[in-house]
Amino acid sequence: MKALCEVEERDDLILDLLTQLRDEGMFGGIHGAPDELLLHSGGPQSDLSQRSLLMGPARRRYIVRQPSIESSSAIGSPLRGEIDLQPHPAPMKIHVENWDDGWTSQEIIFGTDLADGLRQLSHHLPLAQGDAFQAGGLAGLLTYDMVQHTEPLRFQHPPDEDSILMILYLADRWIVHDRIESTIEIHSSIDNDGWV
């Protein structure tokens, strides 16, 4: 944690910070990618909506794209239990990319399914220390179509080839707005991080 300061009680403060960071060029350039990820807690304050998190500029991401597959020849109705199954979930390729004035491919990780692929990413992550919030984990989004890599389903209508199905960032930097405590914390897992 870099800094801790008290802020006024405003639920949308993290949005103002995001705008300010954009205006000051703190996303992209020398600090990392211009990609943004905001996990915004709005609505009534509770233990389930206590914090909003803004990821700082990413330096590494993991992408899964839709592979080339043949559509299922069996046409059925899943609502009537007519589901075309295969022996195993579809294997996957996770493209590891680093930011260097653009995303560049570093390696490809092959997984027999989603769980196997994600387990292979564990060596990219810092070791967890305690149970408090810490930077350096994975954050991003997975589309519904990733189910082909968790269940042995064969799609009747697969996504377009090369569509992005998953994008996870190595989230080394976070700005955390605690709405209940009215504080801002800045976390980084990067030694001597110039962005912080």
Predicted segments with their positions:
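Signature of the chorismate-utilizing enzyme
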Residues: 1-196
